């Protein structure tokens, strides 16, 4: 996979789409590839399996989340509304 110093993994797009968009894509992909906190066991071991599917490598919990992050802003608001009486 081609990479460049300025845009990392978005270097695969070459000179297309402009630098600003490629930097934004690189930032989103970098966040996506990080390990995230598991909502079940609390460990930082959640990886993306496919679009919207996340799995904890420690406890094996599989759950649906956002396409690029396990918890979306709308999901956090909904969870807050459900948990409070």
From Swiss-Prot:
The keyword Oxidoreductase does not apply. One of its GO terms (molecular function) is structural constituent of ribosome. GO terms for biological process: translation. Keywords: Metal-binding, Ribonucleoprotein, Ribosomal protein, RNA-binding, Zinc, Zinc-finger. SUPFAM superfamilies: Zn-binding ribosomal proteins (SSF57829). A zinc finger (C4-type) spans 38-59. Gene3D superfamilies: 2.20.25.30. GO terms for cellular component: ribonucleoprotein complex; ribosome. Its cofactor is Zn(2+). It comes from the Archaea. Binds 1 zinc ion per subunit. NCBIfam families: eL43_euk_arch, PRK03976.1. Belongs to the eukaryotic ribosomal protein eL43 family. This is Large ribosomal subunit protein eL43. It comes from Thermococcus sibiricus (strain DSM 12597 / MM 739).
């Amino acid at each position: 996979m081609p990479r460049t110093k300025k845009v990392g993994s978005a270097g695969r797009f070459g000179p297309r789409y402009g630098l600003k968009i490629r930097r934004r894509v690189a930032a989103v992909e970098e966040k996506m590839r990080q390990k995230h906190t598991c909502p079940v066991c609390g460990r930082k071991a959640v990886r993306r399996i496919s679009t919207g599917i996340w799995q904890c490598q420690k406890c094996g919990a599989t759950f649906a989340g956002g396409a690029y992050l396990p918890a979306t802003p709308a999901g956090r608001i909904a969870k807050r509304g459900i948990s409070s009486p």
